[in-house]
Curated annotation (Swiss-Prot):
GO annotation, biological process: intracellular signal transduction; negative regulation of TORC1 signaling; positive regulation of autophagy
Membrane among keywords: yes
The entry's keywords: Membrane, Vacuole
Protein's name in the database: Vacuolar membrane-associated protein IML1
Pfam families linked: DEP, DEPDC5_CTD, IML1, IML1_N_fung
Gene (UniProt): IML1
């Protein structure tokens, strides 16, 4: 029966079965599955009978209310069937039951169609995987009827309650299953017991979106939810109740099916519909070429009018949520002398040149069009592309005076000046010589730091390169090697889309110059494949003037591919390679439309059984030859040609007028008679129009001997007859005697055609023997080589035409040697391209198939296998090619010398090979060579057996070791290898014009992406599946070196890992759990689990990694590989033995070629908002330093004492969030009705408090802490985290209150659970106020301190949160914090304490309370002791009149030194040079272990590190950083989403931010730069700011260098994120729990979270869009499937969402209105009104509005001057109204007012505003007003000034939501 793979493809003309590769692959998979999936399983040995049996029954359909099971099978109702629990049963509709039924398309069986092949016939596929094609000869209506599919299920126990209610129920399926398979309720079905091996799926594709899944999660999902279960198309998978996936496609041996069994050997493929796409469009010179054969548009129109719209449409059809980045890139060439007055950019020091200095000067350009834009905004993307195309060529062709290196410099430097007017000084290079590798390398930087600042809603990064070329690129060898190393170490996929027609050679093809020194020492990256294809350039005598002018797009060899051949006077070596990490496609809108139209038409019947005839299409030639174009195609300018007999002395040529030479060369290939339809399946380098069937190729193409040879015309007629006439069968030629074979003239026929594969494209097909000048040969040769039916021991030989001088000597055989069998091939070579018409010349060449090796001058025998591996079939070269990887460069001999150019003979030397002897097992062994090389080793025999047929032209890539030669030299001498082995195994060396005949193994050509392809893809079609939903790197692979290669070519590092019994509970307790975690960690870092026969051969305890019981066995061996690193994990007793294999580095090469670890690359990049191109210096090098796997495994096992900084050393996954204070939603205030009297600041603090309670509730407590908790105390509420709330910035707090911070107990939030024994615990019913007051103020009581809040200093007070905790821990009958608050209010009612401002009752939070006078114990350390007792209960002003100001620097220094003196003896800093005076260390953040899986849905502990601020100013951002090593990101995302809902209720916006600062974004993302904004007018002199401490009345003065810049940012609703590291005192060691502060500039974030801003040292602004700010918005995630359309968004209501500015706000923040005494003419600089729905809908719009409004304000000199004056005036007014400062008011001025708390930001509004808007109760409002009146208003801070001006404050405007 014909396989579906044999008829796939839009251009298939004939009717062919599956290709040989497909059949071989399917047979391998089937055999592997049969061997692995036994029909008699150990757990159920009797469940699968030997022969299937059927049983008819009635099918029911149920819903979820009836049962949640998909299938119910009542075994008692089927007593005669013999079913048991565990059987695999197939459900199919009974014959005739579905006839005539009208089913919906989704209800019937799927008419499966391969994407990209629109003309593929669609067949209903059943569970067995084979199409129902036996009815082709029957009724057409029957063939077109849709039939229900077949469903598989495993019998489970029948629920007893269902049996009791429905005893007659036989089989029932769920509604969704019935709809998917077309089952009807009460219909008759057949039940068939199936063997698991018969129904096992080979591949299963699953899709997911809006999730970040690690590959370890995919592995766990597969083992938990898929293995040993039947699956079906459309099935929903739910893992851990959170991770969701859908089964997209199911394959059995490459065929799609609806249902199958997921065996342990099934390969899962995970595809993401929410990925990050980076589209590179190569703007080479061909992009502006016109399409001469199509519409006449330029090639760029194909991109903008057809390709991109089609891509966006397909994304919209699948509802994808991708982020798109588009970059235009090109390389501009400057190849002419530039005058000295030209731009400095044309200086040689600024441009790139070739390594030899002879190449033209070039400069690479990158223009970012869009960056991280949602795919739904395709109209914006296309508009941006069109606009950029208009100016791109102008911008890159006219160089600027010089390239700026910073964004600010780009704004200052004019593009053109009078001295340097614009001048076109360059032109784009061709696509061949473009900078494609550099672009790929730069784009891969997206994954270099993927563990830092992780986006938790997207998975995968795909690079798409659109090029106008044909897929051939000339690249530097070193960059190709470095890029291959980088890409193989990162899980990133690359798609290459070519706009030009596909050439007739292998693509994608990288052409590179080999290093001059081609030998290296052992340890080089020795490939497990054959040597790369290398050929030598001809000398200048063979110039391109003698070649056919193949200078148009679409030719067999493009002009770019032929440029420079023969141009160098000295010989240069070239290599060709096909990378495994590139997926190539070809886009032609005409073919796409034609294929779409053909897919809609009805297919016609074919005379051939089991095939389908395609609609006829016009013949479109792929090759355009100048000779054919110049003559009429229908003209008859042919002449007879005769081929002379071969001469034993020289190659005789005969000149004949033949204009058909080119025609013969273009169509002179015929399929092999023994190819069985495989040769006609088409390949990537031969057009489908050339495919044909031949009934008898011996009669029609290959005459048996010279007597039957006819003239060329008759031969062509026979050829035409063979093309246009179909024959059902081919005949093999008869075998003739050896004598006759030796006597007659043999012709060689072309190789067989194979279906190409994706990543190797056309390289998997058969060689193209039409030598269309691949190496500058001055003739075109047509050869037909007859394939002999010899034994496998006799490999085919490669021939080269002998020269005139050495032909006789070579042909003379040695005595006592067997007579060689020779063959002759015909060659038609064009003699010149002059005015006379070209003539066809016939020549012969000798093929020696059995000859003894002759000694060569280089000590080399032609038998050398390396020589055989590297020689080519083309006659263009006059010397043997260089050897393979194990061959040093031989000396040139007489035969190596180039032939005389005047002779122009097409002959070449005969390559004579040594006789191979046959081993006992039938393998071919090379004869030992004496004194040839100083290397040793043997070639694996299986390579010769597998690929002997293909070594005639160029051997295929081997799967074993590289070829080593025997040597009689020093056995200890290291082997030498080829330089191009550095590219292996990630770039396959290939002869592009004569690729191997036999397809190598899939693992050899697909590399790491082998298991992504269920079936062999096509090169000609666009890989839409990869472009729509890119696949994650497969979990498994099959590439593994042999045991001998691991020993010789790899460095081994063994170590053992054992479980720490004393470790915390979150680490695994068993060896199996530890092994799972070790495998998961490696999968998360890009490793793949190696499976297949190679692993079985090297491990005795190998078991399938998808088997749930496999990892628990002793001796289990797991191989994992990533690039050049292989890990072997072996379970040995109770330990795990890890052996790390690292490929030896390259040695022996020139330093400038390979030994350098990186290359400095300086492209010119222009980002979206950049004014000009800026130079970037990028290091194109290998991946970062090697991961410390020993420490990582020890960390997983619980050994963590030796790790000092696990976050950075072990590369934890890290993400950072901030809580931004925004306006409290009106709807949320109803939920906190008890806090109506609170101001907004207090509500924000309450929200943080609620979050900390949640963190404490889900906090992981280690066993050592858990054991100290009694059972009675475990039920009590967790204590909130100890966060110090301040109204100053952290740097000010550290400088002013260093003593207090050092005395703070860092473990208060981890206080002991019990302070008193159970016998001493208090009870509420027997306590007195006096006794309780003594306990509270005692040694173990509540902490009493003097605390400052804004402008007031409160003495001897305690915090409500701490008092609640104390009550909870010291009272036996108080178990919850609510009970403690209730008891505290009772105490407050009885007069034990009161609020410091008498505004609030007792609350659990950051509220200050004081003990009543009658119960107070005077503390000598308190400031309250300095005053009379009657004044102690009141808060005093912050600025006493009797104290003068002190110098800030001296005061800070004195305070710091005092702190050091007092604490130096207590601190022990290792390595300190001054142990007596060490730096005090202060941590501004703490961490705890948080359990993200409180419901225990995962099979492992899910614990992360949660870092939070220890010191927090309510006006600033509250920082949260998460880090984890082996947790599930989806559970982390779920925890974050629960925080979002809690924070929103209290006016806090949880926003994800980048971990690095905005100014350093270019270091990690080359295509992003901050946008600079400069002030049009310099601000006036900076005023002096002051601050006060809680322990001193002295007002400390500090200069605020960026006072006005901070005021501008606050004006535009920015809040402080992080301060610069220079803001902290230099004599204090400040750090966070995640590291030390490293920000160079202070950073602010907009309240929407959309924009980051920094202030540089020069006072400029740097703005950067935050691409994460909307990723965790519940609205965006809920409605993300609507592509952010504003009309479809209805987010939850927020305050001020729909409030216009002219309406009074019902919330705290009033609308900004001009006040008397201010200039109302100054317009507000607040950004335009932006609602919450707009912010969640379009981040670009929000970002642009903020940027534009801020830029407009900073560019308006009048507004700036008015703003500066207003700020100075307002600050002066607030300073002069201050009571204590009035004595020194004579010193005040508008620019230098009195020193006050300018550095203390505040959120609190004036009391009058607060009282009016909050509607406080009358007594409370009066008390607040009185307290405010008693307090002097010392306002010199930015907040105080902003509140007194008419400019919109952070509380005014629509942003406060």
């Amino acid at each position: 029966m014909l396989q579906s793979g044999g008829i796939k493809g839009p251009q298939r003309k004939q009717f062919q079965p599956a290709s040989a590769e497909a059949r071989s692959m399917r047979a391998t998979i089937a055999s592997l599955q049969d061997s692995k999936v036994d029909s008699a399983r150990p757990d159920s040995p009797q469940y699968s009978p030997k022969s299937p049996s059927k049983r008819s029954c009635t099918l029911w359909v149920h819903d979820e209310t009836f049962s949640r099971e998909e299938v119910l099978c009542n075994l008692q109702a089927l007593p005669d069937f013999g079913l048991n629990v565990g059987y695999l049963v197939e459900v199919s509709v009974a014959q005739g039951d579905h006839l005539g039924s009208q089913l919906k398309p989704e209800a019937g069986s799927r008419y499966l169609q391969d994407e990209g092949s629109f003309t593929s016939p669609r067949w209903p596929i059943g569970a067995g995987g084979s199409a129902s094609r036996s009815t082709f000869g029957g009724d057409a209506k029957l063939r077109s009827r849709k039939t229900p599919g077949k469903f598989l299920f495993i019998v489970k126990p029948f629920p007893p309650e269902v049996r009791a209610k429905h005893p007659n129920l036989q089989v029932s399926v769920a509604n969704h299953v019935a709809n998917a398979f077309g089952f009807k309720n009460r219909s008759q079905i057949h039940l068939t017991v199936r063997k698991r091996a018969q129904c096992s799926a080979s591949h299963v594709e699953l899709i997911f979106r809006d999730q970040f899944l690690l590959r370890s999660d995919m592995w766990r999902l597969t083992m938990s939810e898929l293995v040993d279960r039947p699956i079906y198309k459309g099935q929903k998978i739910l893992f851990m109740g959170s991770i969701k996936a859908t089964v997209k496609s199911v394959y059995i041996s490459g065929n799609k099916t609806l249902s199958a069994y997921f065996s342990p050997n099934t390969i899962p493929i995970f595809r993401s519909e929410s990925a990050r796409f980076v589209l590179f469009i190569q703007m080479s010179k061909e992009m502006w070429d016109f399409d001469s054969e199509g519409t006449g548009d330029i090639l760029f129109s194909r991109v903008i009018n057809s390709l991109m719209p089609e891509l966006f449409k397909r994304w919209a059809n699948i509802d994808a949520h991708h982020l798109v980045t588009i970059v235009l890139f090109t390389r501009v060439q400057y190849d002419f002398a530039t005058p000295t007055s030209g731009p400095a950019t044309l200086n040689s020091s600024f441009l790139n040149r070739g390594p030899d200095g002879s190449a033209p000067k070039t400069q690479d350009f990158y223009r970012v069009v869009v960056n991280d834009m949602p795919s739904g905004q395709w109209t914006t993307i296309l508009d941006s592309l069109k606009k950029e195309f208009r100016t791109f060529l102008r911008d890159v062709s006219i160089p600027p005076p010089y390239f700026p290196d910073t964004p600010i410099a780009a704004e200052d430097i004019p593009r053109f000046t009078e001295s340097h007017p614009p001048k076109i000084a360059g032109r784009p290079t061709s696509a061949l010589r473009g900078n494609i590798l550099e672009a790929i390398h730069v784009a891969s930087s997206y994954l270099a730091f993927e563990h830092i600042g992780r986006d938790l809603v997207r998975t995968g990064t795909s690079i798409v390169i659109i090029t106008p070329g044909t897929g051939v690129f000339e690249v530097p060898f070193k960059i190709l090697s470095l890029t291959s190393d980088v890409l193989t170490s990162r899980a990133i996929g690359i798609d290459l889309i070519c706009l030009s027609p596909m050439p007739l050679h292998s693509v994608p093809l990288f052409k590179y110059k080999l290093p001059r020194d081609t030998s290296c020492r052992p340890g080089s990256s020795i490939s497990s494949r054959l040597a790369p294809y290398e050929h030598r350039r001809m000398s200048a005598t063979f110039s391109t003037a003698h070649m056919s002018p193949l200078d148009r797009p679409g030719t067999a060899l493009s002009d770019q591919a032929l440029q420079g051949i023969g141009s160098s006077p000295q010989e240069e070596e070239w290599g060709y390679g096909i990378p495994h990490w590139v997926d190539i496609s070809y886009w032609d809108p005409k073919l796409d439309r034609a294929s779409r139209a053909a897919a809609k038409k009805k297919t016609t019947m074919s005379p051939v059984i089991a095939t389908i005839a395609k609609n006829s299409q016009l013949f479109v030639p792929k090759v355009r030859m100048y000779e054919i174009q110049m003559m009429g195609v229908m003209e008859s300018e042919q002449s007879n040609i005769s081929i002379p007999h071969m001469s034993s002395t020289s190659s005789r040529t005969q000149k004949r007028p033949g204009t058909l030479a080119s025609l013969a060369a273009s169509i002179g290939n015929s399929p092999s008679p023994d190819s069985s339809y495989r040769s006609q399946a088409g390949d990537g380098f031969r057009p489908k129009s050339f495919m044909y069937n031949i009934k008898d190729s011996k009669k029609s193409m290959l005459p048996p001997d010279a007597k039957e040879r006819t003239n060329l015309v008759e031969w062509m007629d026979s050829y035409d007859q063979s093309i246009f006439h179909l024959h059902p069968k081919q005949k093999r030629p008869r075998r003739r005697s050896k004598a006759k074979q030796a006597a007659e003239t043999e012709t060689s026929r072309p190789s067989q055609h194979e279906t190409p594969k994706l990543r190797s494209s056309m390289d998997l097909g058969q060689p193209d023997n039409r030598h269309l000048s691949p190496f500058g040969q001055p003739h075109l040769q047509l050869r037909y080589e007859r394939i002999e039916e010899e034994s496998l021991v006799t490999p085919r030989r490669i021939t080269q035409p002998p020269t005139q001088t050495n032909m006789k000597s070579i042909m003379k055989p040695k005595p006592k040697l067997p007579i060689p069998r020779i063959s002759r091939s015909i060659s038609f070579a064009l003699r010149g391209l002059g005015s006379a018409p070209p003539r066809a010349h016939a020549s012969t060449e000798v093929k020696t198939e059995h000859a003894q090796a002759l000694p060569t001058s280089g000590g080399r025998t032609p038998e050398d296998p390396a020589s055989e591996a590297s020689n080519t079939v083309t006659p263009r070269q006059n010397s043997p090619l260089n050897s393979g990887a194990a061959t040093p460069k031989p000396e040139r001999s007489e035969a190596d010398a180039p032939s005389n150019v005047e002779a122009m003979t097409p002959s070449k030397p005969i390559l004579i090979r040594a006789i191979r002897r046959t081993g006992e097992d039938g393998s071919v062994e090379p004869l030992p060579l004496e004194g040839s090389f100083s290397t040793q080793g043997t070639e694996p025999r299986h390579d010769l057996l597998q690929h002997h047929d293909s070594q005639g032209a160029f051997p295929v890539k081997r799967t074993g070791r590289r070829l080593d030669l025997l040597s009689s030299g020093d056995p200890t001498s290291p082997p030498t290898v080829s330089a191009t082995d550095a590219l292996s195994p990630w770039v396959s060396p290939i002869n592009p014009w004569n690729p191997p005949k036999l397809a190598p193994s899939r693992s050899s050509w697909y590399g790491r992406w082998q298991h992504v392809y269920p079936r062999i893809p096509k090169t000609t079609s666009v890989k839409w599946k990869s472009l729509k939903s890119p696949a994650s790197l497969p979990i498994t692979a099959e590439e593994l070196p042999t045991e001998s290669e691991l020993t010789s070519n790899f460095l081994q590092t063994p170590y053992r890992v054992y479980q720490n019994d004393e470790a915390d509970a979150e680490v695994p307790k068993t060896r199996e759990m530890l092994l799972r975690d070790m495998i998961s960690l490696r999968l998360s870092h890009g490793f793949q689990i190696v499976v297949g026969k190679k692993v079985e051969e090297q491990s005795t305890g190998y078991s399938n990694i998808f088997d749930t019981n496999a990892l628990s066995k002793d001796g289990t061996t797991v191989f994992m590989a990533r690039g050049n690193v292989i890990h072997r994990l072996v379970c040995v007793e109770g330990e795990i033995e890890v052996t790390k294999f690292t490929r030896r580095p390259l040695n022996g090469f020139p330093t400038d070629e390979l030994n350098d670890a990186s290359i400095s690359y300086s492209p010119a990049v222009k980002t979206i908002l950049s004014a000009q191109y800026c130079k970037n210096t990028i290091s194109l090098g290998a991946p970062p330093e090697e991961y410390n796997w020993n420490s990582a495994d020890a960390f997983l096992a619980g050994h963590r004492d030796h790790i000092t900084n696990s976050i950075r050393q072990l590369r934890f996954w890290r993400t950072r969030f901030v809580l931004i204070p925004v306006q409290v939603p009106l709807a949320a205030r109803r939920h906190i009705s008890s806090f109506h009297e609170d101001n907004e600041e207090e509500i924000h603090l309450l929200g943080i408090y609620k979050l900390t309670q949640m963190w404490q509730r889900h906090r992981y407590i280690p066993p050592e802490e858990r054991q100290f908790q009694s059972a009675a105390r475990k039920s009590k509420d967790q204590n909130p985290l100890n966060i110090i709330y301040q109204t100053s910035d952290p740097s000010v707090v550290v400088a002013a209150e260093l003593d207090r911070l050092l005395l703070e107990d860092p473990g208060l939030d981890n206080a002991p659970a019990q302070l008193l024994p159970d016998s001493e615990l208090l009870q509420r019913y027997n306590i007195t106020l006096a006794f309780l007051a003594q306990k509270i103020q005692g040694e173990k009581g509540v902490r009493m301190m003097d605390r400052r809040w804004h402008w007031r200093l409160h003495y001897n007070c305690f915090v409500g949160m701490e008092f609640t905790t104390w009550l909870l821990q010291n009272f036996r009958d108080i178990d919850t914090r609510e009970e403690a608050v209730e008891f505290g209010n009772d105490l407050m009612t009885h007069g034990l304490f009161h609020h410091v401002q008498r505004r609030h009752n007792f609350r659990d939070g950051n509220y200050f309370y004081q003990i009543a006078d009658e119960y107070r114990v005077v503390r000598p350390e308190s400031r309250g002791g300095w005053f009379q007792p009657r004044k102690v209960d009141k808060s005093n002003p912050n600025t006493p009149m009797g104290e003068a100001m002190k110098d800030s620097a001296s005061s800070i220094r004195a305070r710091a030194e005092k702190s050091i003196d007092e604490t130096g003896s207590k601190l022990d800093i290792p390595g300190s040079s001054k142990p007596s005076r060490p730096k005090p260390s202060i941590s501004l953040a703490k961490s705890l272990k948080y359990d993200v899986d409180p419901r225990k849905r995962s099979d492992r502990p899910e614990v992360i590190d949660l870092h939070y601020d220890r010191i927090h100013n309510p006006e600033n951002c509250f920082h949260i950083e998460l880090s984890w090593m082996n947790a599930t990101p989806k559970l982390v995302e779920d925890a974050i989403m629960s925080w979002v809902g809690t924070a929103e209720k209290y006016g806090l916006k949880l926003v994800e931010l980048p971990i690095s600062e905005a100014s350093s974004i270019v270091e990690r993302q080359v295509f992003r730069r901050p946008y600079p904004i400069k002030l049009k007018v310099d601000p006036p002199p900076t005023p002096v700011s002051t601050y006060l401490t809680a322990t001193s009345f002295t007002s400390q003065a500090v200069p605020d260098h960026h006072f006005y810049q901070k005021a501008i940012l606050k004006k535009f609703d920015f809040v402080l994120d992080f301060e610069a590291k220079s803001a902290f005192p230099a004599n204090v060691d400040v750090c966070y729990s995640w590291g030390k502060p490293d920000y160079q500039f202070p950073q602010y974030v907009h309240r929407t979270g959309a924009v980051l801003a920094q202030i540089t040292d020069e006072g400029h602004f740097l703005l950067l869009a935050n691409r994460f700010h909307n990723s965790h918005n519940p609205v965006s995630l809920k409605d993300s499937n609507k592509f952010d359309r504003s009309s479809e968004y209805f987010p939850r209501p927020r305050a001020a969402t729909f409030d216009p500015l002219d309406r009074r706000s019902p919330l705290l923040s009033p609308v900004a209105r001009p006040t008397p005494g201010t200039d109302s003419s100054i317009p507000s600089a607040s950004p335009p009104y932006i609602s919450a729905s707009d912010a969640s809908q379009n981040s670009y719009r929000v970002t642009d509005q903020i940027k534009d409004s801020m830029r407009a304000f900073c560019s308006d000199a009048e507004q700036l001057e008015a703003f500066f004056a207003e700020m100075a005036m307002a600050k002066g007014k607030t300073a002069t109204t201050a009571g204590p400062a009035s004595l020194s008011s004579v010193k005040l001025s508008p620019t230098t007012p009195a020193t006050v708390d300018s550095s203390i930001p505040s959120l609190e509004l004036p009391a009058s505003v607060v009282a009016r808007n909050l509607h406080l109760p009358q007594p409370v409002a009066l008390a607040a007003a009185q307290a405010s009146a008693e307090t002097p208003q010392v306002a010199g801070s930015i907040d105080a000034v902003m509140r007194s001006t008419s400019v919109s404050s952070p509380r005014n405007g629509a942003f406060r939501h």
